[in-house]
Amino acid sequence: MNLHLVDSDGHLEAEKKLTEYLTSIVAPSVSPSRGSATADGDYGNGALEAVGLNYHVVGVFGGQSSGKSTLLNHLFGTHFQMLDETVRRGQTTKGAFMALANTALAGLEASDVAVVAPRLAPSAADRSSRLNHAVAAAVTNNTTGGAPPTGSPLLVLDFEGTDGLERGEDQCFERQLSLFGLSIVDTLIINMWAVDVGRFNAANLSLLRTIFEVNLQLFSHSNYEAEEKPTLLVVLRDFTEDDPLPSLTTVRKSFDTIWESITRPAQFEDTSIDALFHLKYYVMPHYRLQKEEFMASVETLRRWFGDSRCSDYLFSYHSMFRGVPLDGLPAYLTNCWAAIRTSKDLDIPTQREMLAQHRCKEAKEQELMTYRDFARGYEDRLLRGEMLLRLSEVLDEEMETRLTAFYRQTKLYSSAVVGQYANELETELVDATMQVLNRLSKAIATEVLSNVESRVLNSVEESLRQLLKSAQTLPFSAGEDSSTTEPAEAHDADEDAARLLGAQRMDSAACQRLVRGFWRTLSIQVKEVVAEVAAMPPRAHLYGRYAVLIVQDPTTRLNVLNIVTDAFFQKVKSRLVSMANSACDTMHSGFERSLTYNSDGTVRFFATTRGLQKAVPAAVQAGLVVLGSLFYFRLKLVSAAVSDDDDLDTGATAALPQSRSARRVRHNRCHIVFDDNDAEAAFYLSYSTLDTAPKYPCDVPVPTLDCDREEVGVAADCVLLSQQATVRAYELYKQKCDFTTQLQLRAAEAGNQRLPAWVIPALFILGWNELLYVLTSPALLVLVVVICAVFFRQFFVSQWHAFEETGPASVVIPVRTVVHALSALVRSLLGDGQGSCPERAARNGSDVVASGEREMAHVKVTSTHADPAPSNTTVPTAQATMRHRTTHKLD
């Protein structure tokens, strides 16, 4: 059962209710023979009198939401309300709560102790401080009669956390609770996170300064006794290091620093902090990560409070060291709180700091208001569509004027306080400046985006086309030799195509290199567009009517570049997300492109079903490589401070002024890069065969979207396809590929006009005399050759294509080489070429090398279908018979 001792508004519970509460929690632990029942049957007061001084009070201070209530509940078996992190983080304990420790817990068992005679009562009336007069007023009859009780109650106080959003900068209530706690407790627990050791604000060292100051106020009287000092127990929570000594040494140095910085009475001028406190330290393991070790440390710490035989027992006296009997505790608390609430000097650390803070805050608000009024005028002019040249320079000059005025008004105050408020003023001034500059920059960025948006989106399509060209010529790592087995009949073509397709094994490492090449190419092409936007002098076709303004305002120019870069990144990501949502259609489009066009961009025709069957595996492989490129977004928008690619906007930042707004804009500069970390480098699809779905990288952990992680890994918001979506896309893709392949096979079979194999030998046998006559007559031979070249050219070409598709590679490749050489020689002799054969061959070879290096670096492939050649020809639309798409959006 808990008592709300002090509510959030600073109201203490009534004295009568305090008495009733203490009676209700203490009476069960007191033997009836120990209590002195009155004539009115008031057994409760007798129970409190029976306890006398034989009790202890423990309190806890610390930052808000730092686990104070959790620690007390585990340590003393109390039931204070704890923070529910699933709902929100905020204030849980408001004011102060009191509860009785569960003495049935291991380490807190009741033990027989002798009650020490009250030592402080005779001198209480002689104390001079107002708080100690309250003590004397409360302790009027502090002698306890009868034998001591069998148990020593332990009262636990849970105080409101400091540094909370609800209180804001108001530290008055915090200091009042600190003074109230020190006037009550025997042991004060300071709850501190181990990671905050060495910090001032995060470790709540301002609270410790308050505790030291108010404790000096309590004991600045002439009758001060050296034994009259509480125990300060510093508990370091979530400690994960092996050696606590460095952290404890740092904590002690922080205490000494605070102690030396406060103003002390003459009697404590040359003393250390140990003159006012018994300092103790304890470290506890992580509450969540080391739950068992944490509970073990709780049991150990509990013995410090309950086992008098423990070497670290905290209560040097077996009785309440303030000398206040339990029946006088309600009056003592009431008088102490009344004295604290009327003490106005508790509102501030010192009068001098208060005055400096008040004056600096007033000057800061005045200058900030003046600047905002100034900036609002320019913002209104921008809303009216005015063209403001050198706007950033005007705003920077006004910022300097406001900061100079602030320093002039506060030059006589504490430099530390002035510096703090000056930094706050500068930050808020720059924020107001950026608000105006962003309004102008967004208008310019809109103009730029309207002119280059299509180029950014085309870079995605161009990178995908280059990926398909490289994937189309990527050889398989292993597979059956399809050239040794030919279908016996035309109706077995579908079965043979399926067998050939499943027999191919993909080169997984080469496919992953192609995926990396796709993202590297995409990042380079987007950077080229960004570089054009950042080029000086600015391009008129990009900036339009803002070109003159951009030349005269470098800060605005770089701010526009920041906005444009971010917009490019978002547009590219949006486009890739859209492609991933319809991954099956995107893959099938790549399959159709690879099946319909050669690697050089020319249209591909199949004279036989065998040629079509040989081209299908490479086309299917190209679509699977596209899937590997779509399932994770690999571009990043990184700060220019951490990016190695600083050559992109050297011209944009070279002439940038060193003003405050320019520094902010430069700090916000980002680059679009492709840079996989260690986790992302392993987050690629693994390929085996064409009839097996790519293996999803399940061994690489992917955090949830709401998980706050500082370590570098796979970004959850960049995963475009889950494992289920990847498998589903593969299955739909295979179905569409099979359907398209069947249609093409049937079309090839229907258009097959090849002569039967016995026709050619029969013609030679039956027409041997005529053939011999033609061969022996030069004029007739020339006439026949001309007629065949004119009227039967297409027939011979189709037969040659059929031979290329069906003939053995050992024969096709040499014959093709000879034919190409003869064709080049004839064209050079006829003078219709673009130079000599060696020159053109060298030029074509260099173009091929340059194209390969530029499009897909780090991927070495050999053509298995056609000779690669450079081409800038726009790819035509695929044939209508190959358009069999449906809109499937994958979850």
Swiss-Prot record:
Keywords: Endoplasmic reticulum, GTP-binding, Hydrolase, Membrane, Nucleotide-binding, Transmembrane, Transmembrane helix. GO terms for molecular function: GTP binding; GTPase activity. Probable GTP-binding protein that may be involved in cell development. GTP binds at G62, G63, Q64, S65, S66, G67, K68, S69. Gene3D superfamilies: P-loop containing nucleotide triphosphate hydrolases (3.40.50.300). One of its GO terms (biological process) is endoplasmic reticulum membrane fusion. Its EC number is 3.6.5.-. Residues 863-880 have a biased composition (Polar residues). Residues 52-318 form the GB1/RHD3-type G domain. It is an enzyme of class 3 (hydrolase). It is found in: Endoplasmic reticulum membrane. One of its GO terms (cellular component) is endoplasmic reticulum membrane. The keyword GTP-binding applies. InterPro entries: G_GB1_RHD3_dom, P-loop_NTPase, RHD3/Sey1, Sey1/RHD3-like_3HB. Belongs to the TRAFAC class dynamin-like GTPase superfamily. GB1/RHD3 GTPase family. RHD3 subfamily. This is Protein SEY1 homolog. It is a multi-pass membrane protein. SUPFAM superfamilies: P-loop containing nucleoside triphosphate hydrolases. Residues 882-891 have a biased composition (Basic residues).
